[in-house]
Structures are given as structure tokens and as C-alpha cells.
């Protein structure tokens, strides 16, 4: 088959199969229950024995195409839930971090690669809060880095305070990167 769907990758044989299939040219879709894209990569690597992990990181760096992490959040108006998505595409910078075992640096790359279609969870949560879709508390609960999220919130408050002192017209653009167009 050209495309393989692996329902849940939670053990060594399943992850080993998925990685090997991807390495041999198959398009593999799979799920891993984690809270971030970096955690997803770590989970796949860490099921292997320590002596095999460098090779697995190298295989993932070469064959991985994208990782998405999803959270459902309660809407502020209680009318249902809204999807928040973290998106990582396997660029040269990401592949290098995976290969070197520096997945803890992936959030920094996500935060600065929006124009390439990537999106960090914390920035997406802040957007949902700013647009009045979710409460600050709901967004904060799902934030990957609570301190960074709080900093984003404080920056936003400072910008709003500065604008309110200046007066005048404020125009907002709802332009979104191509990776977000299909989710709305």
C-alpha cells in the first residue's frame, strides 16, 4: 500500500513498524497521545532502547513530514468547543534538532516559523483568547509553557494600554497562513 494509517502508536512494535514503513517510502499517518509536537517525537524515540535512539532520531529526521498536536477547548460562550492546533513541519532546522536530540528547542522554531506554516500551541491559544473565543483560564490550562503564555498575555495587555492612551483608529487583519485556511 502507498498509504498506511496506524490508529495509535503506543508501543515499540507499532512505532517501529510505522518508522520503518515511512523509511521505505510509504505515507504513514499515526496518532500519539501527547501534549505537544516535541513530546510526540520524544515519545516515539523513547520507546526504543537507549542504544537504538540515535538511529531512530536520524530515521525520524529523514522521514517525518509533519506533526500536529490538537486540543479541544471550551468556548467562552459555552456554545461548544473549539480546536487549537500546534503544527510542526519538518524543515532542515527541525530535522537537525530531532537528529541531535534537542527537541526541547522545537517550540522556539515553531514560534518563529509562522510564515512557513508552523504554529506553536501557545500562540494559537493566545489568538483564541484575543478573539474572545476562549477565556484566559481555558487557554492557560492548555498552554505548553505557562510562563511564556503569561508573557504573551502581559505583552498584549501592554499593547492595548498603549493604544488606548494614544486614541485613534485600530485596524486588525484576519489574514491567516495557508496552514490555517482549511481549519476554519
Briefly describe each language-model feature range.
Residues 1-184:
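Short, flexible helix-loop junctions that flank or precede catalytic/ligand sites
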Amino acid at each position: 500500500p502507498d498509504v498506511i494509517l496506524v490508529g495509535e502508536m503506543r508501543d515499540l512494535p507499532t512505532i517501529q513498524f510505522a518508522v520503518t514503513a515511512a523509511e521505505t517510502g510509504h505515507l504513514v499517518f499515526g496518532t500519539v497521545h501527547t501534549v505537544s509536537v516535541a513530546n510526540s517525537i520524544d515519545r516515539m524515540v523513547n520507546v526504543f532502547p537507549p542504544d537504538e535512539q540515535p538511529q531512530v532520531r536520524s530515521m525520524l529526521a529523514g522521514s517525518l513530514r509533519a506533526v500536529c498536536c490538537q486540543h479541544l477547548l471550551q468556548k467562552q460562550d459555552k456554545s461548544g468547543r473549539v480546536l487549537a492546533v500546534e503544527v510542526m513541519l519538518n524543515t532542515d532546522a527541525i530535522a537537525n534538532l530531532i537528529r541531535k536530540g534537542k527537541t526541547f528547542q522545537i517550540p522556539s522554531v515553531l514560534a518563529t516559523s509562522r510564515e512557513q506554516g508552523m504554529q506553536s500551541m501557545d500562540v494559537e491559544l493566545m489568538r483564541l483568547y484575543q478573539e474572545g473565543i476562549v477565556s484566559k483560564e481555558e487557554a492557560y490550562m492548555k498552554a505548553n509553557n505557562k510562563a511564556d503564555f503569561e508573557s504573551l498575555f502581559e505583552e498584549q495587555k501592554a499593547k492595548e494600554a498603549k493604544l488606548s492612551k494614544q486614541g485613534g483608529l485600530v485596524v486588525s487583519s484576519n489574514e491567516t497562513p495557508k496552514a490555517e485556511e482549511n481549519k476554519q
